[in-house]
Amino acid sequence: MRRFILYLALCVAALLQPWQRVAAQEYEALDYRDFKFYKEEDNDISLWAGLNDSLITEPQTRSYTPNSRYALSYATSRYRGEPLSESRSLFGNTVVDYTTLRTLKALGYATNEQNGISRAQLSGSTNQTTAILSGAESRLYERQSLYADLSGRNYLIGINHRGVYSIDKYGVPLKEGWMIMDYARVRTGRDLYVEGVFTNAVDIAVGASYNGRNDKLDIAISLPWSQRGLRQASTEEAYTLTHNKLYNPTWGMQNGKVRNSRVATSLRPEVIAMWQRRVTAVTDLTLTANAYFERRGASTLSWFDAPTAAPDNYKYMPSYYSDDERVIVERAWSTNDLHYTQIDWDRLYLTNSVQQDGAARYAVTLRRSNISHIAINAGLKSRVGIVTLNYGAELGGDSEREFRVMDDLLGATHIRDIDYYIMDDASYSHLTDNNLRNPNNIVNEGDRYGYDYRLSRIGLKLYATAEWSLSNFDFAVGAQMMPELIWRRGYFEKELFAGKASFGRSQSITLTPAMINASCRYSIDNHNISATLMLGANTPDADDLFMQPQYNNRIVNTPELATTISSEITYSYTAKRFRATAAIYLNSTTREIDVVRYYDDLAGEYSDAVVSGIGRIRYGIEATARASWSRYFSSSFALNLAQYRYHRNPTVNIFTDNDNILIAKTISAMRGHHIGAPEISLYGDICFRHNGWMARASVQYWALSYVTPSVMRRTERVLSYTASNEETEALRFQQRLPDAATIDIALSKYFTLTEETSLGIQFTARNILGSNVVYSAYEENRISLRRVGSRTDVTPFANRLSYAYPRLFSLSVSLRF
C-alpha cells in the first residue's frame, strides 16, 4: 500500500511541473522542395532515440564529460568534428548501435566511455568507444525507480519505470545468481514551442543477467515504438519575416486543427545476448548474438504535375518578386498569414476535388524503410604470460528494403504510377511507367508505388588484439578485416531501365575494409602519457555505391574504400583535488565517395553526381579539468580548439538520371572549406554540494562554426558560367555562423524518505540569456539562373538553417525504492 501511495504522489507532483530533457527534435533534409529525389539525413540521434533520463549531477573527468557533452549539444557540436556514426558501442566484442546502447543503459547496465582512438582496437572508432559492462562489472543491483515529467519540448507528458530484481538462492543474496531487469517508458503530447512538433512513444524492455563461477549470461529484449511530428530547416528570410526563430514550414491548418506533413514512425523489436565461459585457466570464450528488425516511416507532402506545396519554396518568398508583387507577398509573410506561411491544406483538397479524372495532384506519401540486422560473434581471450590476446570472428549482415506507400490522397481517388518528371520530355515521355510488372498502374491509398528495392550486405569480420605491460609501459595492437558483399535487388521494373537494369539482383560489389591500431602508454606517479596510431580502410554507404538505387542496378564506375589515418597523444594528471586531461589529435580521410542526386540547373536535368576523391582533415587540441576547491565546491572545464576542413578537391562526374549519359566531368573547389562543425567550444561550471543539495551554474561557448558546404555549386563547371568576380565569390563563399554563448543553471535536492526510498527533485534553466543559437545549417545544391538583358546571372540558393530552442525551464522528479 505504501508503494502505491508513493507512485500516486509522484505522478501527481510531476504532472504539475514542466520539465525537458531531450535534444531538439530537428529534421535536416538536404533539399525537400520540388525535386525528383528526396534523401533523408537522419544524422541527428535525437530523431530516433531519447537521451538517458537519469539526473546528471556528477561531472566526470574525461574529455567531454556527460555534463559538458549535454550542454554543448545545444548547438550541433560534433565531437572532434566527426559524424555521430563514428561513435561506437561494444557489447562483448560486437559493435552495437545507439538504440541498443540506450536499451541496455535503461535496463541498468553500466558503461565505460573512452574518447578518441586509444581503445579502438575492436570498435574501429575515431571518435568515442563505449564499452557496455556485463556480468559482475555491469554493477547491477536490486532497485526500482519511477519517473514522471511534464515537458514542453518535443512531448508533453512522460512516465517511466525501471526495476532490477535479484533471484536469491536459498533466500539469501549471493554474488552468483540471476538478476532480472525491466524498463517501460511512455511519452506523449505536443511541443509547446514549435508548432506541429509532437511525440507519441512507448519503450519496453526486459532483460536477465546470470553471474556464475565459470559462466556469465546476459540477454535483453526490447520493443521501442514512436511517432513524431518533425521540424524542418528553413531560410533566414522566413525566420525574419515571421519574427520566429522556431518557424516550422511542415504544418498547416486543416478543419481548425494543426496537421504536420512530416511524421516519422519507428518500430524495432530487438534481441541481444552474450554468453561468457572460462574454458581453461587462461582462456575465456565469449559468444554474442544481436538481431533486430526495424520498420521506419517518414511522411512527406508530394505533388504530381502540379506546383510545389512547400510554403517556404523560393518561388513563394518575397525575395523572388520585385516591385508591387514583392510588397504584397512580404506583407502576407510579416503578418503571419497562414495561407502563405504554412501548408494550405484546404487549397490542396480543393485542387484535388476539381480534377475531372479523380486523380490527385497533391498527396501525403510515406517513405518506408524495413531494416533487418543480424550479427553472431565468437571470441576468445587468452592470457599468455604478460600478453593478453583477444581474437575471434563475426558473421553479420544487413538488409534495408526501401519503398514508397500512398498514405493519404487528400480527397482524390488515385494516382497513376508513372514518372511525372518526364511526362513532357520529348525523348522519354513514352517511358514513364515506374513498374512494368504491374500493367494496372493505378495507385490507391495503402499501395506501394514509385520504387521498391532492397540493399543487402553480408560480411565476415576477423579480428585480433594483443595487450601487454612492461614496468610502467603498456602496449596494445589490434587488427581487423572484413571481406563483404553488397548488392541491390529491385522489385519494380522501371520502363526507363527495363529488364535487369532495374529488376532483380544487381552485380555484387566485393570490398575488404580493414583497420590496424597501435598504442602505448607510460605511467609514473600521477602522470600518464599515451600515443595511438590507427590506419583504416572503410566501406562507403551502400546507397553511395549505386547510381540511383531507387530504380537502377548500375554501380558507380569506381567503388572503392575510403582511407583513414588517425593519431593522438594524450596526457593526464590525477591528484586528490585536481584532475586534468589534454590531447592532441589528427584524423585525415581520403578517397571518400558520395553520390548527390539533384536537379542540375545548367543542364535542366535531374542528375546523379558521383563525387569521388573527397578528403577531409580534422585536427586540434582538447583539454578537460576538474578541481575540488573545498569540501563543498568543485568545477569542471572542457576546451576544444580545432580545424575541420576539406583538404582535397574531389572529382565530380555528372550523369543524366534518365539514361546515365555523362553530362560533365569536373572538379569541385572544396580544398580549404570548413566541414561545418564548431571549431572552438568551451565549457565551464561551478558546483556546490552539501547534505543532498546540489547547485550548478555552467557556461557554454561555440565559435568558428560554418554552414555545411555544397560540393555541387563549387564545381569548375558552375563557376565557368559566372559573368563577374562577384558572382564567382558568392558561389565560393562559405557563411560563418554567429558565435554563441549560453548560461545554464541547475538545482537539485535528494531526500531520504526511508532506508530504501529516496526522492530526487531537480530544477534546470537552459540558455537563461535567451541567446539565438543556430543549431545547424547547410547549403543548397541548386543555383539560380536569371536572364538579365544579354547576360545570365548565376547565384546560389539561400542557405537553410534551424535554430536551437530559446530560454527553457524544467523540473524533474524521480523516486527510487
What are these regions (language model features)?
Residues 247-270, 274, 506-515, 519, ...:
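Outer-membrane beta-barrel signature, preferentially recognizing the C-terminal barrel domain
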Residues 234, 438-442, 485-496, 522-567, ...:
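Surface-exposed extracellular loop regions of Gram-negative outer-membrane beta-barrel proteins
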Residues 58-60, 94-169, 176-177:
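A beta-strand signature from Gram-negative outer-membrane beta-barrel systems
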Residues 217-274, 297-365, 428-443, 595-597:
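Acidic/polar loop-and-plug regions of large Gram-negative outer-membrane beta-barrel proteins
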Residues 4, 25-33, 701-720, 747-817:
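C-terminal beta-signal and adjacent terminal beta-strands/loops
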Residues 155-231, 263-281:
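Transmembrane beta-barrel wall of Gram-negative outer-membrane proteins
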Residues 469-472, 584-588, 606-713, 816:
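Gram-negative outer-membrane beta-barrel transporters
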Residues 363, 388-524, 549:
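Signature of Gram-negative outer-membrane beta-barrel scaffolds
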